[in-house]
Every structure is written in structure tokens, then in C-alpha cells.
């Protein structure tokens, strides 16, 4: 069964690209035609590539990969946060801080600061401070939450990055590539497909299209991890059955020895 239907793509407006004068020629093979100065994306290719991306992401999730969702423009912020949380993965949906991946140790220090402020707020420590100091710490926490809240539980750099609009998220993509982190991206007609490992050509400026593709990537992660959990449960059951069998064997052997 296909991950996405043609009807879903059409209803979401996934086929509308950018103005022809703003295109990146490297996206030519994913363009069907142009109408009224707008490129139209070949949704037959989008269907196939979205399906390939779904299966690839599902496989990575089944193998235990950690994911990071990135989408900081206004059309993507809500979908990125909602779907990342649903899939239980890290996300960045406001400005990408340079060095988030390539200078992870420094970022981790700031995340630890955020966690300290969270704890202080929760245990009532802020209430014991002078109003001015409490206000300053509150503002500091709010700023850290905005930019780092989505990656606060990320223990290390991710194994895979999903991006909405790699042109907008150019710095994030470059950091990922420098660390050999595979990039899965929803890419429009103005993007450079050569910077992306797993491509899904689609309108990355339409909120409904962004929500559709992002939700499918979240679905793939959830499905892959459920398969991983099922495999772990199966392995545990096999081990338990084996242990029970060994217990039966030992009991049988003891009985035979007693009879002898």
C-alpha cells in the first residue's frame, strides 16, 4: 500500500512549485510542466519518491536510528512540532542555531542550562528570588525553550535528519552533510536536490502539503519502531521460552537421576 495517495497530494496542493524564474535547474527532472509562470511538480514522481522515503525512514527507525525534524519557516513550524512530538523525536522549528550539530558540546551546555532553569521553576525556586532576577531568569528560560526546547532530550547528534525546505534550512543541511548524517527532505522547485540524500519533491510553502509529508514521515518512524519493539518482544519471549525449556529439562533430569 502506497504511503501517500495522489488525491492527498492534489488536495494539499503539493504539485504547485515556485515561479519559473526562481527555479533551480537541477530540479528539472521532477517538474511536469509550467502554467501561468508557475512550475508544476510531477506528482507521479512525488508519489514514488514519497513511498521510497517512507520505507527508508521506516527501516532506519526499525534499526534504532534517532531522528531530528527541522522546519523553521512559518508554514512548517506547527507541523514540525506536532509530528515530531507524535513520533517521539527531536525537532527544531524556530531559528537554527549555527553549530547545533557541528558544535554539539557547546549546544549541550546550553541545553543543560535550560534543564536547570526548568527544574528551578518547577520546584518553586523562582518564587524565592527578587522579582527582577526571577523575571530575567524567566526570559532566559523562554528564549532557550524557543530555540532548544525541541532538542532538550536529544542525547547526541541524530542519525537521520528530516527537513522541510532545504534551501531555507541550508545551514542545518550543510552541518548534517559535514557529519555524514543522511538528509531526507521535502524539496520545492527552487531547491538543490544534490544536497539531499532522500528527496520528496513537493510544494514546501503550502501548510497542508507540509503537514501531509511531515505526518507521513512521523508515521514511518512510528511504524518502524513498533516493528522494532515487536522484534524485541519476540526475542525476549524466545529467550523466556528457552529458559523455561531449560528448567523443564533440568527438572526432568533430576527426576531421572532420582529414579535411577
Curated annotation (Swiss-Prot):
Pfam family, one: Ribosomal_S2
Ranges of Acidic residues composition bias in the record: 243-260
Biological process annotations from GO: translation
Region (Disordered): 224-260
Entry GO CC: cytosolic small ribosomal subunit
Keywords: Ribonucleoprotein, Ribosomal protein
Gene Ontology terms, MF aspect: structural constituent of ribosome
InterPro entries registered for this protein in UniProt: Ribosomal_uS2 (IPR001865), Ribosomal_uS2_bac/mit/plastid (IPR005706), Ribosomal_uS2_CS (IPR018130), Ribosomal_uS2_flav_dom_sf (IPR023591)
PANTHER family hit by this protein: 30S RIBOSOMAL PROTEIN S2 PROKARYOTIC AND ORGANELLAR, SMALL RIBOSOMAL SUBUNIT PROTEIN US2M
NCBIfam families linked: rpsB_bact
HAMAP family the record matches: Ribosomal_uS2_B
Homology family: Belongs to the universal ribosomal protein uS2 family.
Protein name (database record): Small ribosomal subunit protein uS2
Gene of this entry: rpsB
